[in-house]
Regions:
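Helix-coil boundary and interhelical linker segments in multi-pass alpha-helical membrane proteins
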Residues: 15-33, 82-95, 146-160
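Membrane-proximal helix-loop-helix units in multi-pass membrane proteins
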Residues: 83-142
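N-terminal amphipathic/basic-hydrophobic helices that include classical n-h-c signal peptides
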Residues: 1-18
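Terminal transmembrane helical module of multi-pass membrane proteins
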Residues: 142-192
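N-terminal signal-anchor/start-transfer transmembrane helix
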Residues: 35-52
Length: 193
């Protein structure tokens, strides 16, 4: 009986070491993702602050519709990268962390797909794709990668990485659009209504 217990504990320890090695291979990627996301969130806040003196019609609504999702995408990348660098993950905890972030993102981006409860909608078809469809797919990669991670860690982490890169690229694109909008708004433009 004791030898069986040792084998069981030894097998668990080996699996934990294997998992730590799997996550360790991705450590630089997660560091890069979290640093990029944190830096770009800061730059986005600088852009918003510099553009605050430019009065824009329905400015608050536009911030909610355009800036908030972009910050959420950056924050998702930062948060997931931080979660996956925690030491002593098991396959279950790493998989759950990834899936929970993915499900939260699916709910958030899905709310754009269903129209945000009938609120005034600034989105055209291109904006619906950029703010709803692409993030929904990226968060779906997180969920699928988290499930796959439980069975095949490298493949699962590759899908999670693809989702993270998609969100980061999307948030950079959205940040650029916001920056161009802020710069193209004439200084001191007043609401016409």
């Amino acid at each position: 009986m004791p030898s069986g217990k040792l084998t069981s504990n030894g097998g668990r320890k080996e699996r934990l070491i294997e998992l730590m090695n799997e996550l360790e291979r991705w450590a630089n990627f997660y560091l890069l993702m979290s640093a990029a996301a944190a830096t770009l969130i800061g730059l986005l806040f600088v852009i918003i602050t510099l553009g605050a003196e430019r009065s824009v019609e329905d400015g608050t609504a536009k911030i909610r519709m355009y800036v908030t999702p972009t910050v959420v995408y950056f924050a998702s990348v930062l948060f997931l990268a931080a979660l996956l660098t925690f030491p002593n993950h098991t396959r279950l905890t790493a998989s759950l962390c990834t899936c929970l972030v993915g499900v939260a993102g699916l709910v958030y981006s899905g709310s754009f797909l269903i129209g945000r409860g009938g609120k005034k909608n600034y989105y055209g078809v291109q904006d619906q794709i950029v703010y709803a469809v692409v993030p929904f797919a990226a968060y779906g990669l997180h969920v699928f990668g988290g499930v796959l991670f439980f069975h095949a860690p490298q493949r699962g982490l590759t899908l999670v990485a693809a989702g993270m890169l998609s969100l980061l690229a999307l948030a950079i694109r959205n940040s650029w659009a916001i920056a161009v909008d802020v710069v193209s708004t004439p200084r001191g433009q007043q609401n016409s209504k």
